[in-house]
Amino acid sequence: YNKVATVNTLEGSTWTDVTPQNVPSKAGDGVLRDPLSPVFDPDDPNTYYIGSWLSGLYKISNDEVVANYFTNNSPLQIYNNWSCIVPSVQFDRDGNLWIAEAAGGTIDKPLMILPRSKQQNVDISASDWITMSVPGMNFNFKMHLMISPSTNYKLMTDGTWSSVLVVL
């Protein structure tokens, strides 16, 4: 963990570095670190979300960080006194943003949904999110959430050899 990340685009045969600058992060150095599970906003091709190992969830639009969802504006919590891990980020077919927080069983409701109607708000708070628990699921950094665009089924696994498969 704590690895510096870059974001690049490919046009034809040319790669261009479009890594966001001045990124709010736990390290405090303005650098994007430890990206997990990037996903494009289905309503805006210039916007994407990236989970992170230390600093929650980033919303990036036109190559700039426009939001960092952390403990101050989401239900995310600090785990083990040092990290806020978001290993899985997805959109459902209605445009709702789903995230899972890896918390080693320390959070009651580690599955979180930011409804489409709230995503454009400037001041998003924890109360804007819907939270839920999933009995039997170990929300760890290997967990994965997939959402079918045609059926809207949600599949989750914790990524371990003894994993359960949950269908919502």
What are these language model-derived features?
Residues Y1-L168:
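Carboxylate-rich, polar loop motifs that coordinate divalent cations or form catalytic acidic clusters
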